Amino acid sequence: MSLQNFDPAIARLIDRERNRQETHLELIASENYVSEEVLQAQGSLLTNKYAEGYPGRRYYGGCKVVDEIENLAIERARKLFGCEYVNVQPHSGSQANQAVFLAVLEPGDRILGMSLAHGGHLTHGASVNFSGKFFQAFTYGLEKDSETLDYDQMEDLAREHRPKMIIAGASAYSRVIDFPRFRKICDEIGAYLMVDMAHYAGLIAAGVYPSPVGIADFITSTTHKTLRGPRGGLILAKAEYAAVLDKTIFPVYQGGPLMHVIAAKAVAFNEALGDEFKHYQQRVINNARTMADVLTRRGLRVVSGGTDCHMFLLDLRAMNITGKDAEALLESAHITLNKNAIPDDPQKPAITSGIRIGTPALTTRGFGEAECAEVANLIADLLEQPDNTARVENIRRRVMHLCECFPVYLLT
């Protein structure tokens, strides 16, 4: 029996979401479109299999096939990133971060991460998150004028507080991160270095963004975003930490791994090993830079003045529109992105003074620099006259046409 016949309510909602994805331009930096092959693996009967433990060391029978699948995922990830150790079992990037913390830290230990207010992530020490509740968290930020990472401040805080772990990585930072400089201060004070590369993983795999492999003690990531795989987590590390990380993921922190998701991760890693993936990631950066340049020429302020990766922030204060209102305005024209705090944002987190723009999904659709320049101009047109309903409707129609020209999936 088909899903349509058995559960028409869910089938209709899936169809509605499919239609939304096909008819909206996706600019959320943390979203992407997986391939049909990744969808097939994730939607497979592997979802039926329980496999607590690790290949060759399971607590259930019947795991010979899924052992091969997990080993293949590990092998491909090691080849992709050139690392010594890989764990593909984390269910998410946040859980990968938690696992690393639990592996080598004790409650109350000091950590140093990037401030959420300056582009960091909740799991890097925010007070509302487990990382800020169970550990004594200190945060570094950006230089006021350049809006780039303040390495001097980070080093001063490290020497003052002597954290047991320093975290490099961000969720809304558009510039290259100097991982060797983090390593140097960690060595000076005797701290672990963890790099959260969730946003940059695909770029790193393709060699278009500096790699922390061989520099950091621990590297965590999601497997979606720029890596263009299923939603899930990943841990890379030096071989000396293999035993403690394996034990922390299972049995300390998780139970059975999601074998259908691990299979989908393996497919995504295989895709990322191909030459086309490398070309794709360079196009992602080119498209982001093109959009940032166009918006700058249109009079909007790009935080830090540009981008070295797949995303950037727009400061909307001069436009007299909040990030929340801009998000809603753009969505009414079928352009999807997210409100985002700018450095030292005077607005509340639910309102914000900025928006974040990312190009992974547009690039997956086949958009090049010309199309991305047009989209940037459409965004500027909307922000300049947010109350012009006729303009909004005209832009919505143009967006719909672009979506038709560049479908996400070739539906039959």
Curated annotation (Swiss-Prot):
Its cofactor is pyridoxal 5'-phosphate. One of its GO terms (biological process) is tetrahydrofolate interconversion. GO terms for molecular function: glycine hydroxymethyltransferase activity; pyridoxal phosphate binding. Its main location: cytoplasm. It is found in: Cytoplasm. The record marks 224 as: Plays an important role in substrate specificity. Pathway: One-carbon metabolism; tetrahydrofolate interconversion; Amino-acid biosynthesis; glycine biosynthesis; glycine from L-serine: step 1/1. Its EC number is 2.1.2.1. Keywords: Amino-acid biosynthesis, Cytoplasm, One-carbon metabolism, Pyridoxal phosphate, Transferase. It comes from the Bacteria. The modification N6-(pyridoxal phosphate)lysine is found at residue 225. One of its GO terms (cellular component) is cytosol. It catalyses: (6R)-5,10-methylene-5,6,7,8-tetrahydrofolate + glycine + H2O = (6S)-5,6,7,8-tetrahydrofolate + L-serine. (6S)-5,6,7,8-tetrahydrofolate binds at residues 116, 120-122. It holds the Pfam family SHMT. The keyword Metal-binding does not apply. Belongs to the SHMT family. Homodimer. Catalyzes the reversible interconversion of serine and glycine with tetrahydrofolate (THF) serving as the one-carbon carrier. This reaction serves as the major source of one-carbon groups required for the biosynthesis of purines, thymidylate, methionine, and other important biomolecules. Also exhibits THF-independent aldolase activity toward beta-hydroxyamino acids, producing glycine and aldehydes, via a retro-aldol mechanism. NCBIfam families: PRK00011.1. This is Serine hydroxymethyltransferase 1.
